[in-house]
Amino acid sequence: MDAAAPDTPAYLSTLNPEQRAAVTHEPAAPLLIIAGAGSGKTNTLAHRVAHLVLGGADPRRILLLTFSRRAASEMGRRVERIVDQALGMQACGAGRAALTWSGTFHAIGARLLREYAETLGLSPSFTICDRGDAADLMNVVRHDLGLSAQASRFPRKETCLSIYSRVVNTQAPLEDVLKQWFPRYAMWTDALRGLFAGYVQAKQKQQVLDYDDLLLYWAQALAEPALAQDMGARFDHVLVDEYQDTNALQAAILLALKPDGRGLTVVGDDAQSIYAFRGATVRNILDFPAQFTPAADMVTLSQNYRSTQPILAAANAVIGLAAERYTKDLWSERGSAEKPEIVVVNDEADQARYVVEQILSRREAGLALLSQAVLFRAADHSAQLEIELVRRNIPFVKFGGLKFLESTHVKDVLAVVRWLENPRDRMAGFRSLQLLPGVGPKTAARVLDAVEIATEPLFALESFEAPPAAAEAWPDLLALARSLMAPAAPWPSAFEQVVAWYQPHLERLHDDAPARAADLQQLERIAATYASRERFLTELTLDPPDASSDESGVPLRDEDYLILSTIHSAKGQEWKAVYVLNAVDGCMPSDLATGTTEEIEEERRLLYVAMTRARDHLDIVVPQRFYVHQQTAYGDRHVYASRTRFLPNRVMPLFHSRSWPPPPPVADAPAKAPLPRLDLAGRMRDMWK
């Protein structure tokens, strides 16, 4: 690291020259920071925010947009620590650098929509439905319109929601979305348009917003010049992390808030744009400088603090073949004689055995399991490895699978909380009521119809005559409703009441109730960290914990376990040793993502992201064949694979290539006497004489 000038403030002296240039850049001018993998992006962004605060900026007028709630919390802690250290703890004072406006686009959107609800014609008590509930509501509308009974297969509810979401987030016409991403459903264009109109009406009737609405309503509000000016004037500085993973709607929001770019800083890496399946577009970061006149300034962070130079040389070569990118070659002061490995194996079984052998070998050499990770393109690619890990009794945690909040019992409890927060949330009420014995879809619908037309929802519930089978459980539901519908229902004790009410239903509905009850205890602990029921529901819907995250019970911190993860879930992480599975065409790139140049380039970036997670050791495994099941007329069979096109021959000198298992050594054997020659053809003829 180059030495800082003698008069450089102490809090800037730990930064390298590129980082200092980014941190101290003119605050008013628009700025793009291209931050390569492992280049200290988070530290640089935190220092820039702290530098603004130390320069006199009001932290309450700084908007920080991050990719996750956890990232926002971590960024806030770093900023406060930097400011505290710069001013001294005594001078700082409580809350001197507290960022009151930091979070994801969706979380900030939800907060602003509640503040401007009256102006926007929204109910301030609107609830936010998660993807599962949104799909269920889509299905209700689909059924009401008679689309589920079509002779020619109409898309399923999840597919309908995906199409709707893609249209909203890409801001592309429905016809174009169907043509590019869902061509098999192009024949249903008019029916889908009618379905989506009905879906919007249903949400408005129930006073619920889905995940996409938080951005859509925010963007629509900003389309009104007076509102755009009012919202934009709240913030002197807007900083955006992970800008390469934003979609067209988010970019539109940003430009509406700061149309001249004043006080706007975005940070990201075009080489790590891997979320197109969510509607993200790499064009946002590639086109950012040209959005302003004069063009936005750009600072590139190229010094990597994570990986060894041989790993970076290989990763640079892979991404260097991209069709379009910002020129950036990562470098490191961490030298090593060890090149990354390309390991060719026979099949998936050998791949699993190789990875396990390497993991155990490195563990014996002192590398803990927690310092090692296995990465793969799709969640099902690790199936064979998981079997081998279980067989060898190696503990592991998998990221990228079922989410914590997707568990039935967790969704049940959250539905009750949501319904009693907003009794007109029909999907939450539908799920909650059917927890009672003897209450089916028809009875639940009658209850919700009564609630919908009533001035006081609680009175409608108290007036409803419960079916005989639910007579015993109905009073408990009414008591819970009276408590939680009260104007000042205390939190988090309100959540504890819901869990206590649900406990007998849990035992009646599930054989494994004790294990599920432990999840609900964990959820109680999570609820206790939020100031209000509204904040709890909003944050958990927008940024749910993984099934294997700290919030939902991974192995104890003093235990050692291996990490398995999809590449998407591994973004932002690092390990000393990384193993990349299935580096073959058909898996990487996925055979479902080879339709356009844009899709191919995103798959290339996925491999790059996987490679740059490794600090010291990188093993890329190439199985030569796969056993596939139920493939058309050919049945179960072996198919042969070729090394991924992203590792062409020209980059191979940067790797150490080998096969596994190695061929057995050839032992010296005594010379053999020549074998006799046989006339088998003659013998075959003689058989018929």
What are these regions (language model features)?
Residues 1-8, 650-689:
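Acidic, low-complexity intrinsically disordered tails
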Residues 7-37, 44, 63-64, 71-72, ...:
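Conserved helicase NTPase motor core
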Residues 31-33, 39-45, 53, 59, ...:
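Helicase P-loop NTPase motor core
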Residues 43-58, 78-82, 255-257, 292:
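Walker A/P-loop NTP-binding motif
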Residues 57-61, 96-99, 137, 260-263, ...:
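Short glycine-/polar-rich loops that comprise or flank the Walker A/P-loop
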Residues 61-163, 286, 343:
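Conserved P-loop NTPase-based nucleic-acid remodeling module centered on helicase motor cores
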Residues 131-203:
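Coupling/switch/interface segments within P-loop NTPase motor domains and analogous charged loops
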Residues 181, 185, 237, 368, ...:
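Conserved helicase C-terminal RecA-like lobe
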